[in-house]
């Protein structure tokens, strides 16, 4: 075996089928597009969501709700997330560094979900009644 004779194993490579290259290729003349019609033409295909002139579903259904611009600035943290953190004094910066909340978060709310067994001190965070009770029961505090 020499470097100039190396080639892939049989069946390892599938060559792209070239269409429109004569009768003998099996995909000449119409190139697998059939005869006439919009889909046989070059550039002949409809837009995504086009339903042949019928009013599209996206326009038939009413508009509903809105997307709050405040969403990226708010975040919720579970007690189980606090349990997993290596630090005991928890503020927004500690949560961002641990990747628990997004970089844009400004208002963080701790909710009662999961269990907390270690003593933690919250600074600058909002806690729900249940979460506050659970934190204090574990010997921690909410400042």
From Swiss-Prot:
GO terms for molecular function: rRNA binding; structural constituent of ribosome. Residues 1-52 are annotated as: Disordered. Residues 21-31 have a biased composition (Gly residues). Keywords: Ribonucleoprotein, Ribosomal protein, RNA-binding, rRNA-binding. The keyword rRNA-binding applies. One of its GO terms (biological process) is translation. InterPro entries: Ribosomal_uL15 (IPR030878), Ribosomal_uL15/eL18 (IPR021131), Ribosomal_uL15/eL18_sf (IPR036227), Ribosomal_uL15_bac-type (IPR005749), Ribosomal_uL15_CS (IPR001196). It holds the Pfam family Ribosomal_L27A. GO terms for cellular component: cytosolic large ribosomal subunit. HAMAP family: Ribosomal_uL15 (MF_01341). Belongs to the universal ribosomal protein uL15 family. Binds to the 23S rRNA. Part of the 50S ribosomal subunit. This is Large ribosomal subunit protein uL15. The lineage of its organism: Bacteria, Pseudomonadati, Pseudomonadota, Betaproteobacteria, Burkholderiales.
